């Protein structure tokens, strides 16, 4: 079988095997900062993405087999300290063609081009952690976790009790036998008595959606003015995929 795995417990400023796009950078403290922060304040109209440099063999044309995968990461989103700001827009984990480039900012999360955001030829699967209600395509549950298949309008959505500034841990798995993509988010700190875990799943046919080889990574965006901003920091990330051996 073909296996690939990696683990970043933190990130190095000269991190090999990561492709940083647009505003993404690694901070001196080892965080993968996807969107710009200036003087401690998130910047408006920021878009940043980070991809694992090695493409992943996610399905095999000769056998028709798909890979199973699991990815685990932790992140923090912090709204600006000013109470008049709204947390905007969110971050996503995604799989896309190997030559994937940043797309439209704002509510499109850097994943979709404004004019083709409903086009099934996008070849992208994403799990979004969306803090802002875009009335044109989002359900009214805000903030929410969504599973996106080729379009910014999520195939499946679950409400999410976003906790400003708290570390969230996420596990995303894909099982080819059931074509089941499952994402869970937990706030492990137990600082509040509120609900702290969320789960969402959807049937996704990876073979019908993305190319045989994909790149995986994160994308995040902020809003268009200083009233619609937040930070997007990935603290750790691990991934493992397994594709069954080629049939002779």
UniProtKB/Swiss-Prot annotation:
UniProt entry keywords in alphabetical sequence: Calcium, Glycoprotein, Lectin, Manganese, Metal-binding
What highest taxon heads this organism's lineage? Eukaryota
Please list the residues annotated as glycosylated.
119
Annotated binding of Ca(2+), by residue: 130, 132, 134, 138
Query: From what organism does this protein derive?
Result: Cytisus scoparius
Query: What GO terms are given for molecular function?
Result: carbohydrate binding; metal ion binding
Q: Which family does it belong to?
A: Belongs to the leguminous lectin family.
Q: Specify which residues bind Mn(2+) according to the UniProt entry for this protein.
A: 128, 130, 138, 144
The protein here is known as: 2-acetamido-2-deoxy-D-galactose-binding seed lectin 2
């Amino acid at each position: 079988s073909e296996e690939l795995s990696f683990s970043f417990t933190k990130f190095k400023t000269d991190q090999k095997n990561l492709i940083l796009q647009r505003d993404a950078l690694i901070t001196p403290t080892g965080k993968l900062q996807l969107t710009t922060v200036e003087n401690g304040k998130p910047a408006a109209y920021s878009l940043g993405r980070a991809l694992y440099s090695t493409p992943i063999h996610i399905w095999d044309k000769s056998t028709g087999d798909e890979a199973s995968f699991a990815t685990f990461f932790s992140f923090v989103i912090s709204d600006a300290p000013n109470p008049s700001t709204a947390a905007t827009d969110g971050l996503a984990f995604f799989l896309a063609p190997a030559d994937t480039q940043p797309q439209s900012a704002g509510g499109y999360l850097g994943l979709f081009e404004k004019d083709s955001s409903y086009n099934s030829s996008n070849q992208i699967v994403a799990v979004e952690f969306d803090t802002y209600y875009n009335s044109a395509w989002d359900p009214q549950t805000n903030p929410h976790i969504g599973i996106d298949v080729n379009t910014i309008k999520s195939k499946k959505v679950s409400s999410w009790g976003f906790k400003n500034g708290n570390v969230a841990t996420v596990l995303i798995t894909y099982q080819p036998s059931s074509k089941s993509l499952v994402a869970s988010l937990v706030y492990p700190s137990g600082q509040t008595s509120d609900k702290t875990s969320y789960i969402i799943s959807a049937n996704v046919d990876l073979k019908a959606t993305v190319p045989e080889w994909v790149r995986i990574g994160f994308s995040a965006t902020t809003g268009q003015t200083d009233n619609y901003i937040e930070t997007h920091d990935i603290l750790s990330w691990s991934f493992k995929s397994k594709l069954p051996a080629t049939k002779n």
